[in-house]
A protein has these predicted regions:
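A general structural signal for short secondary-structure boundary/capping elements
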Residues: 67, 128-134, 143-148, 298-310
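Short, surface-exposed loop or secondary-structure junction motifs
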Residues: 92-260, 264-268, 272
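A short small-residue
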Residues: 41-42, 203
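Short active-site loop at a secondary-structure junction
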Residues: 18-20, 42-98, 131-143, 209-212, ...
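Catalytic loop of the DD-peptidase/beta-lactamase superfamily, centered on the K-T-G motif
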Residues: 1-36, 202-310
Length: 310
């Protein structure tokens, strides 16, 4: 990563008034942080070692865990949802593959009035507020990944969070990863939009079990993607093979575009994305607390074309 490119990326953040950090490749597996502050309020500064709600960037964590269970032959892409949740309407017609690529036909857009406490409450809420459209076309729904998280838990006889800690956080020494319930507002950059309350943030993250309940620092998220995703070419190849059969090339938590994988995360007050070349391991991430989803999408596209050269 040369100085000139770093300057260009910083200029991009500055000219678009993005309060946040970008992470790009440094030496080896390490990341270089590019920071732009649009505020002097320390409570609102985004930092590479400060917790940040992962939102949908968590889906690839869940997808990776599912892949590893598939490798151990504990489940397969064709395994029926009925195996784990026979009480769900139409579960016999839904496979793990369809949960991984958002073609399950399941929908759930409800949010609780109060944050859900613990995995049991999260699963109960999910099951009560779910409906089945019985169509197997692309529909980006968090509930697919909430179910995958619940399946992981049933399969390994541990809570989802405990399993993620044992499987990824411990071996990779990720010390900045917490469930929403363990996080205080002080530990997270507060949204720059005063209309967004901490209550909104906790309600959203608590009901995105497996698809946004975890907070991670940008550095820890980089470490996870670099080691567990980009470091596993067998998995990315398998995900690509699965994704390219679909109307939308998506599988396991990421979109595919040739050798590029990418994902966006968005909850009230927080937006983030990553784009990586899974062959060369070139990668860029963006975490911000003052832009909306449309600005995030535009920034992600700009990075894809101007930085990743895709």
């Amino acid at each position: 990563m040369d100085r000139q490119t770093q300057t260009q990326l910083h200029d991009y953040l500055k000219s678009h008034h993005i309060n946040g950090v970008m992470l790009v490749n440094g030496k080896g597996s390490k990341a270089i942080t590019i920071t732009n502050n649009e505020t002097t309020n320390n409570k609102q500064l985004v930092k590479a070692n400060r917790l940040f709600p992962t939102a949908s960037l968590q889906k690839i964590v869940t997808g990776t865990a599912i892949y590893q269970l598939a490798q151990k032959k504990q489940l397969g892409w064709g395994t029926s949802l009925n195996t784990y949740f026979p009480q769900i309407d139409g579960s016999e017609d839904i496979t793990i593959r369809e949960l991984m690529n958002h073609t399950s036909g399941l929908v759930n857009n409800d949010r609780p009035a109060l944050p859900l406490r613990g995995q049991k409450q999260q699963i109960t809420y999910m099951l009560e507020h779910m409906r089945n459209d019985h169509v197997h076309t692309w529909d980006y729904q968090d509930v697919d990944y909430e179910l995958l998280a619940a399946i992981i838990s049933k399969q390994v006889h541990l809570s989802y969070n405990t399993y993620i800690h044992q499987r990824f956080a411990k071996p990779l020494h990720l010390n900045q990863i917490k469930d929403f319930s363990e996080v205080t507002p002080k530990q997270v950059p507060q949204p720059m939009d005063p209309a967004i309350s901490w209550h909104q943030v906790t309600v959203t993250t608590s009901s995105d079990f497996g698809a946004g309940n975890l907070f991670m620092s940008p550095n820890n998220y980089w470490k996870f993607i670099y080691n567990e995703v980009l470091g596993n070419s067998k998995m990315t190849t398998e995900f690509y093979q699965q994704a390219k059969k679909q109307e939308v090339a998506y599988f396991g938590g990421v979109y595919f575009d040739g050798d590029i994988i990418r994902a966006n995360g968005s909850i009230p007050g927080y937006n983030c994305c990553f784009i990586a070349n899974y062959k060369t391991k070139k990668m860029v991430m963006l975490f911000s607390n003052n832009i909306d989803y449309l600005t995030l999408k535009a920034a992600s596209d700009d990075l894809l074309h101007n930085y990743m050269g895709a």
